């Protein structure tokens, strides 16, 4: 078959508005960079690649990898609002109760399992010592998704450092039906209000607190990121209804590449922050930029040409996206456990400090491989079966 005719035929097809396959690639990219950052914190492996005698350094990307959490929050806004955006093309919506049931069925069992495992390990290793008050605070705050509201349960928790993002997501879920309804009725006003509140919140945090660590990731400071994800979903559905052709695909491919290049430049700027407080301030100052570029990437890639779409949507990215929640929850803990257990042998007591290159490479590979394997086992052996069981039980009870 003529490849040019195939490309032209593909270019004229309207994008899917139910499952945006390129979103899998953007999610996989974001979560792998975040994981690389956390694993790099333990391995100290300098991230470079030598091609044809020329060395390419990924140090700025990895050193600022934490900033890609913003893209993960953006994707949540995009995916959650997509069904609401499809209401404009006649699709039936869902009630707030149905929304809460689906979100809880997917997230809450895995969240509780993580807490149970982490709490068991903490007790077995006497991580709390005699501090029963902190033990209770840590446990209760995590069970109620409020661990971000106190410094010790946020930063000194024994229940997994990644769970704060699930707490933030759960807070967003609580508000989402109201935000979605307002966004659908008054999109410009709701978008402006969410972005404005986020900007004012971050400006106030920066001006009022010498140490912003407890405040810069709170819900109000993330509202613009979430709003941009919702706006991207609305734009995608509207754009998908337009006539597509080679020119549209080429323009969107160019915007995709430009967005990725600008995200790289943003990461380089963030990597130049010299201390912890500068890092947090830099993250707040670049949050709107990350959100705008991420939104452009989501919309443009979904409407890009065949090659760009298949780079972002392939079996590897679809797999990473499918197991992303479990991978995100467990990768940092697994990296710490492997380091403390000295699971990767080395002649040095502290191979990361000594720059044991062979150990660093083996350790990095093991962290990714074991984390992905554990994520797959938990996703397909626990997360999805439990969610199906809970939702099926709810439907059965509703039919009685």
Where on the chain are the PLM-derived regions?
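Solvent-exposed interhelical
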Residues: 170-198, 233-253
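Functionally critical transmembrane alpha-helices in membrane proteins and complexes, commonly lining
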Residues: 21-86, 107-111, 142-147, 151, ...
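Transmembrane alpha-helical segments and their boundary/interface "anchor" motifs
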Residues: 23, 66-69, 84-123, 133-141, ...
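Interfacial loop-to-helix transition and helix-capping segments at the boundaries
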Residues: 18-21, 57-69, 154-168, 207-228, ...
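Hydrophobic transmembrane alpha-helices
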Residues: 78-86, 114, 118, 172, ...
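Short, Lys/Arg-rich, polar N-terminal cytosolic tail immediately upstream
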Residues: 1-20
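Alpha-helical transmembrane segments of multi-pass integral membrane proteins
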Residues: 66, 226, 230, 253-384
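Aromatic-anchored segments of alpha-helical transmembrane domains
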Residues: 32-39, 120, 148, 194-206, ...
